[in-house]
Design a protein with these regions (language model features):
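Phosphate/dinucleotide-binding and metal-coordinating scaffold of catalytic cores
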Residues: 1-448
Length: 448
């Protein structure tokens, strides 16, 4: 009788409200096995012409060989915003690439619809995205899979890239199941605009006020989807009953890592973009994306660059942006105004610092990664930096993170100031004079 009941539940679980867990997709253990450097050969007739038309963002047909497996009629295009423009302006050709397996025909790479190949622009360590994604996964934030990949074009060496699972249908299926919600990539048309929607601010019920969200929907959406998301933003703006509209646990875990890596080209920075928004049944999650300018290097590309390692090593965890920006970022500001959530945020920080850094895991992770990729970096024909600059960048990244962890430990324990205001009154800091931030990667490197 018990066996019959178990079979009945298994056969009818979803109709009874029980969500069936999906098995891991095959591509997770194949291309995204992180224990080795993979191989991708792009076979395309007009590679030079493809590169010359980088601004078109049109798909070109190619064949791809991934770790010895052939895939035909795959869509290939160049991707990126400022990185694409700057690579072009400096007369280089190492663009970020996107492969779309189902662009021309109904096919997948073992269940994967799309992947991108990141060229480590302004990242001499080759590790900024790799490390941040690992931290996000450690904190149980839904995160794209990634792996190092040696890319060749028509059999000729092109370079070491980071293959990344695109946040599209396959990502949603892997993380949320077949009944998943909606995904958006909020982004502005012009940084000079107010862009309240990118900042997730509620400004009324009219759909047009959220164009920067809705025109960047990853899936088809209807009016009910729009109303549901706008209502979530309304609840967020009111600051009450936030758990009805926000996945509090996920958001706090995300911001723990986000604040650690000091990514100023993201939700907590002036631009407010470079994240994905997931909505299901009226609840929102924020998802990680685009970390080549993390670890403070976004500031090095500004008209008046700030090269202050001590400032960023000690960046305050409780006010990780100026008041002008913070007041316009409700997903952080309104959540942190709740004492329970604020204390939970500190608990997650304690977990990250104690388990990821103080335990020795971080040192081992960086060391193993270096040993895995260093021979590929040494022979990379399109690298943005020299092999020696890569070695220095890895040391710099390690030292920055080690000192940052020490500073945050002090901020959590109250021996170091944890807000901008407190830091203006209290000079105590972790000494970061040994860290030279430009070693992580700056625009000047592109001139060499």
């Amino acid at each position: 009788m018990v066996a019959v009941c178990i079979v009945f539940i298994f056969m009818n679980g979803e109709s009874l409200g029980i969500k069936r867990l999906s098995a891991k997709p095959q591509y997770e253990s194949k291309l995204f096995n992180q224990d080795k450097v993979h191989q991708i050969d792009i076979r395309i007739d007009d590679w030079d012409e493809f590169l010359e038309n980088s601004y078109d963002e049109e798909y070109w047909k190619c064949d791809v060989v991934i770790d010895g497996e052939d895939f035909y009629n795959v869509g290939l295009r160049i991707k990126g915003n400022s990185s694409k423009r700057l690579v072009h302006d400096y007369g280089l050709q190492r663009y970020n690439l996107k492969l779309e397996f189902d662009h021309y025909q109904d096919q997948y790479y073992h269940g994967l619809d799309q992947l991108s190949l990141d060229g480590s622009f302004q990242d001499n360590s080759y590790m900024k995205t790799w490390l941040t994604f690992d931290m996000m996964r450690y904190m149980q934030v839904p995160t794209p899979l990634c792996s190092y990949t040696w890319v060749t074009v028509n059999g000729k060496d092109w370079g070491l890239f980071l293959a990344m699972e695109e946040i599209e249908e396959s990502f949603a299926l892997r993380n949320y199941g077949k009944d998943h919600g909606k995904l958006y990539k909020p982004d502005y048309k012009s940084l000079d605009d107010e862009n309240a929607d990118v900042a997730l601010r509620y400004t009324g019920d009219e759909f047009y006020k959220y164009d920067n969200i809705f025109r960047n929907a990853q899936f088809d959406i209807n009016d009910e989807d729009k109303k549901r998301l706008i209502n979530s933003l309304k609840i967020l703006s009111e600051g009450e009953n936030l758990e009805e509209a926000i996945d509090i646990n996920e958001v706090l875990r995300y911001f723990t890592v986000q604040v650690f890596v000091v990514n100023l080209d993201n939700y907590l920075g002036k631009t407010g973009h470079n994240y994905f928004l997931y909505e299901e049944d009226g609840k929102l999650q924020i998802l990680p994306w685009d970390y080549n300018l993390a670890f403070t290097t976004y500031s090095l590309g500004m008209p008046n660059p700030i090269n202050d390692a001590e400032l960023y090593v000690n960046y305050p965890i409780d006010t990780p942006s100026s008041g002008e920006i913070m007041m316009k970022r409700p997903l952080y500001h309104n959540v942190m105004k709740n004492d329970t959530y604020f204390n939970q945020y500190h608990e997650y920080f304690d977990k990250l610092i104690s388990e990821y850094f103080e335990s020795g895991y971080f040192k081992e992770f960086i060391t193993e990664t270096y040993e895995m990729i260093e021979s590929y970096v040494e022979k990379d024909p399109t690298a943005f930096c020299t092999y020696e600059e890569f070695q220095v960048a890895v040391e710099t990244l390690y030292e920055f993170c080690d000192l940052r962890a020490q500073s945050i430990r002090g901020q959590l324990e109250g021996t170091l100031p944890s807000t901008i205001k407190e830091q203006s009154e209290n000079p105590n800091r972790i000494d970061a004079s040994s860290v030279w931030l430009p070693d992580l990667g700056e625009l000047k490197d592109l001139e060499d």
